[in-house]
Amino acid sequence: MIDKSSEIARFSGKGILITPKTLEKPLLKWEKLEIILYKDKIVFEFVDKTIEVGVEDIEDVGAELPKKVIDIAKSTLEDITYHSSIIIKSKEFGNVMVGFAPETSIYGKAPIDNFLRKLFYILLNKKEVKILYNAGENSENTKWENGFLTFIKKRIKDGLVTKIEYRLVVEILDNEDSKIYDIFSNIKDVEIEEKDVDGEIEPVLKILQVKDGKDIISYLYTKDKKVRLFILRYMVILLDYKYIGILRYLQETVE
């Protein structure tokens, strides 16, 4: 029996299991779906099957659903105005995509975003990175700093209401002192460049921000390709940087 006390998040709505075989079927049907997230695994409970994989088997989040799935939903009047996806590596089914959507679009995309915030926390928190902060274009002589991704609380005032948001940042530990780099706000451009990282030429994220009216260029490196992809997906899905730099082409170009 699953220990519900260790649940991190739960999504209740409808979903569809997408594999090369299911795409061959003339009709693809959405059905009731529960997605339960734990610290170390994610469970998809369909009507007639349950799929459980470790979080390390999550390959992608937020990839576009196949056109056939979208077209069939439209033709059958299935309300998937707001939807998302998770690609997993399953022993039983291989690499599969799980599309999911709220039962109704009346609540907007909030049910999806609320779940994905928790999922991205699990996928990104404490992941090791290297950073060149405010390095400018000529950064050859700047030294990489070792750090990790983390989430910090930020109080946001909205009228009379104060909301608490968790913001993704890079934390550096220098002689037991913590240093925070907020590189995921006020973003003007995001590109992928090749730079020297510890003697090897590696792909890194080049992030251009505007702070106090000035342009700041920073470089972020992670040796884990999936972590890099999750960072980009996070910026598109939850920070809404859909039309900036490489993020405009994310569906097509990011491995």
Curated annotation (Swiss-Prot):
Q: Which GO terms describe its biological process?
A: chemotaxis
The protein in question is named Uncharacterized protein MJ1615
What's a Pfam family in this record?
A: CheF-arch
What organism is listed for this UniProt entry?
Methanocaldococcus jannaschii (strain ATCC 43067 / DSM 2661 / JAL-1 / JCM 10045 / NBRC 100440) (Methanococcus jannaschii)
- What PANTHER family has UniProt attached to this entry? TAXIS PROTEIN (PTHR42201:SF1)
InterPro entries per UniProt: CheF1/F2 (IPR007381)
